[in-house]
Each structure stands twice: as C-alpha cells, then as structure tokens.
C-alpha cells in the first residue's frame, strides 16, 4: 500500500510520520503533508499571544488571483514585478509597488507550481508534466511536456528554462521554443518528501537540493554536475527514520550557500567548490534563510531558530508558534518573517527572536516564502490572496 501525503500541514504531518511505528512502504511512496493521519494524531497549534507592534507594517495593496489547491505556489520576482500563479491555470504579473495587474495569462491545464521569470519570459508547470511559457505581455509562447510530475517552479534565466521532475531529472530547455538543450538524471529515492525543491542561479551554476541530504551545483551551460556536498546522511533503521531530504531553496549570501534537511542537519558550504564550512544537527521541513550575520529556520515543530551564519552557533530560538505549520522564512531588514497555516504573518527580531509585529491575511495557509520587490514585502496564501506590505 502506498501512502502519499499531499502538501499542506507539512511540518506537523512529517513529524507525525516519523513517529508511526507500522507503515507499509512501497518503492514509490512519498511524503509531503498530513492527510494520512486522523485529527487525533495532530498536535494542537499554539494559541497566539498578543504582540506589541514594535515594527510598523502597513498593508499597501491586496489582490485575489485564485487558489493554490494542494500545491505550493511560490511567487517569483523579476525587476519591479512579482509573478504569481493559481492552480486553475491563471498566471499574473503584478506591479510590486501597487499591486496593479501588468498582464494576466491562462494556461489550458491545472498548474502544479508557481512561476519562474526573468521579466521577459515566464514559465510554469502543470498536470501531466506540461511546461508553459508566456511572453512579456502574457501571451502563451510555447507548451511542452517533460513526461514527469513537476512540483518545483521552473527557473528562468541565463538563456534557459530549468525544470526538475519528481523522478530525479533536471532539464535545461530553450526559452525560445521549449526544446531540450540538456538533461541531468539522478536515480529517484524509494522514499522522499513530495514537495517543492526550488533551484537558484549562482554565477553560471544552478544550486539545488536532492533527496538523501545532498546539495549540488550543475553547470548552466550543459547540466554537468560540478560539485556535490552532503548536508546530512541517513540515520536510523526504518525507511522513514532514514528519510533526510534537503528541503526548501538553498540560501546564498556572498560566497556561502546553506541548506537544511528533514531529520538531518543545517549546513553551509563554499558556493564555488562545495567545501563544507559548518554543519549541525537540525530538522527542517521548509528550508533556511540568511543575511550577513544570521541563518534562520523553523523545525518540524514550528520552533524558529537563529544561528550564527559564520559558524552555526546558537543565537536564539522562539517556541511560541508550536505546531502552527510554518512556511519558509525570509530574512528582511531587521526581521525574520514567516507565515503560518492560519494566514498570520509573524515578524521576529533577527537579533533576539522576539516578536516585533504580526499581520493577518485571509485566514488560509501561507506555505510559500515571502518575497521582496523593491521595498514591498509580498506574500501569497493558499486561498489566492496576494498581499503587499511596507514594514517600517
């Protein structure tokens, strides 16, 4: 019997999965949420305490673009615009400062990812491995099939549209017509987290995480593996105990790239060579964010941690959001910002982890990481709300 856990309630579901004593596994079993478990197995989310608004956060615009469904629709930023998508097929470019619609396109399939964009070309992926590209006015430019499930937003830039499938392939597509330029293939793991694994450009490399706790760099020119490093190693006896996939997008600051894994570690490496700089035991279902001095992440219990980005030493932790299914955090200015499953956006001091502000969106989960367009902080909810804020 295959138990496939859909995205949504990721942190709580994965934590519970790790504690299940008896679970029939199959070679293609996947994890990514909590639908397998009845409500009696779920932890009660912490009640929110009143927060003194030390940081003024002003909502400057909001729009509705359509629901995300069971997928994580991560917004993308290019220039002054933010690009968002909805499960029903809508792709929208918004002015980051005003929320004004710059253009809107419509795919003819349901979508499974957020968009990737370089400002000229915007690409999304949909059901049955469809990859659809739109031009700078929102007109569909091409559509191809990559013959595999895609849960990660395409990465667009450097004359490429990069697509990764859940069966271990990474494809470099021609942005003019969608034809394949190169392919990188890994053997799929028997058990892995069924989640979005964003990729980033770093110079002429593509940095991305893999199942089994690995982080790697691919050449953008031909897809060759330039280096691979271990964020963590499998531990334990059962398949679930040994599950240690890299989670979230790699985080780059200067010459350092960092990543976290589930049931594994948080670790940082030299961006050019993959040489390790530091690592420590940690388990995160959503990944990390960093700035010049700190690295920040939430664990599967929704405890938020601050580490010294240079050596991994403890800075602080905040356990007031237990089991609230936090999304991927963002370091922005003097705050670490993270959304939860009830649509709250929490602002923590990056210096000591104390709350400095909190705002409410539409009440639906914020699973994707916030993004910054100019000075505007933008978040997208599963309910389809996109909100622009100015923290002061």
From Swiss-Prot:
SMART domains: PQQ (SM00564)
Membrane-spanning residues: none
Keywords noted in UniProt: Cell outer membrane, Lipoprotein, Membrane, Palmitate, Signal
Lipidation feature positions (N-palmitoyl cysteine): 34
Biological process according to GO: Gram-negative-bacterium-type cell outer membrane assembly; protein insertion into membrane
Subcellular location: Cell outer membrane
HAMAP family per UniProt: OM_assembly_BamB (MF_00923)
Similarity remark: Belongs to the BamB family.
Subunit structure: Part of the Bam complex.
The name this protein goes by in its record: Outer membrane protein assembly factor BamB
Organism: Ralstonia pickettii (strain 12D)
């Amino acid at each position: 019997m295959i138990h496939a856990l859909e995205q949504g309630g990721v942190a709580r579901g994965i934590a519970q999965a790790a504690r299940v004593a008896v679970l029939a596994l199959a070679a293609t079993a996947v994890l990514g949420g909590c639908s397998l478990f009845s409500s009696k197995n779920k932890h009660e989310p912490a009640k929110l305490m009143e927060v003194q608004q030390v940081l003024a956060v002003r909502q400057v615009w909001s729009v509705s673009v359509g629901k995300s469904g069971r997928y994580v629709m991560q917004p993308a930023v290019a220039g002054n615009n933010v690009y968002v998508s909805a499960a029903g097929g809508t792709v929208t470019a918004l002015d980051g400062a005003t929320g004004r619609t710059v253009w809107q396109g419509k795919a003819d399939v349901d979508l499974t990812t957020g968009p990737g964009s370089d400002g000229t070309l915007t690409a999304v992926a949909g059901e049955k491995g469809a990859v659809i590209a739109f031009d700078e006015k929102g007109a569909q430019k091409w559509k191809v099939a990559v013959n595999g499930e895609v849960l990660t937003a395409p990465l667009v830039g450097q004359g490429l549209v990069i697509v990764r499938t859940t069966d271990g392939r990474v494809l470099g597509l021609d942005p003019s017509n969608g034809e394949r330029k190169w392919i990188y293939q890994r053997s799929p793991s028997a058990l892995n987290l069924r989640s979005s694994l964003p990729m980033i450009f770093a110079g002429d490399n593509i940095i991305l995480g893999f199942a089994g706790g690995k982080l790697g760099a691919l050449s953008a020119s031909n897809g060759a593996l330039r280096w691979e490093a271990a964020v963590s190693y499998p531990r334990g006896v059962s398949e679930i105990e040994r599950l240690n996939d890299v989670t979230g997008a790699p985080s780059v600051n200067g010459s350092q790239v960092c990543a976290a894994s589930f049931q594994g570690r948080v670790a940082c490496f030299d961006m050019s060579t993959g040489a390790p700089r530091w690592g420590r035991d940690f388990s995160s279902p959503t990944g990390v964010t960093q700035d010049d001095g700190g690295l920040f992440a939430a664990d599967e219990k929704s405890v938020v941690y601050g580490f010294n980005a240079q050596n991994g030493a403890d800075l602080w932790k905040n356990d007031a959001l237990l089991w609230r299914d936090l999304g991927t955090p963002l370091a922005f200015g003097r705050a670490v910002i993270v959304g939860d499953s009830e649509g709250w956006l929490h602002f923590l001091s990056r210096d000591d982890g104390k709350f400095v502000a909190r705002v409410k969106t539409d009440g639906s989960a914020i699973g994707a990481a916030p993004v910054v367009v100019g000075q505007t902080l933008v978040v997208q909810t599963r309910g389809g709300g996109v909100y622009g804020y100015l923290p002061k």
